[in-house]
Amino acid sequence: MNIRIRLLGFVTVTAVLGLGLSGCAGVVPMKPAEDSNNPECANVTVRLPDTVSDLAKRETNAQATGAWGTPAAVLLTCGVEVPGPTILPCVSINDVDWIEDDSQAPLYRYTTYGRTPAVEVVIDSEAVSGTTTLVDLGPAVSVLPKTSQCIDITDVFKN
């Protein structure tokens, strides 16, 4: 067999295998938020970590989004509607306040409070720790301008 034919066959097989293996963790389909073109979201996106809760970052198909894990267990969207006052619990992790919505548990939805634009993170709590995930995302999200903070009910009723 001619060396050119062998080389061509090797290159073809290598390319097909490479495409097949890379396709196992393809692009995560997401929808951009209404304010995803806000320049502040670009500041967040370029700072997103390569790993979150030991899960590798994945490519997404929407502006100002991020995803980690195969299958994706953490989804981030910047530019979501800025939340107003709420009765949902608010947790502060490393100077970033997050509203916690557990109405679809084990999927937990965390939305920044007091940051414009707002960031939403959906976490599969059966795959990763919510606290660890928010700690890992904190440095990227904390670049957003802080406009207010969570308050406790005791803050409301102080004399």
Feature annotation, model-predicted:
Residues 2-14:
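Bacterial N-terminal signal peptides that target proteins for export
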Residues 19-23:
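C-terminal motif of bacterial Sec signal peptides marking the signal peptidase cleavage site
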Residues 25-28:
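Bacterial signal peptide processing site
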Residues 30-80:
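N-terminal secretory signal peptides
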Residues 80-87:
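Short, charged/polar surface micro-motifs in flexible loops or helix N-caps
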Residues 89-159:
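Extracytosolic low-complexity repeat regions of secreted or lipid-anchored proteins
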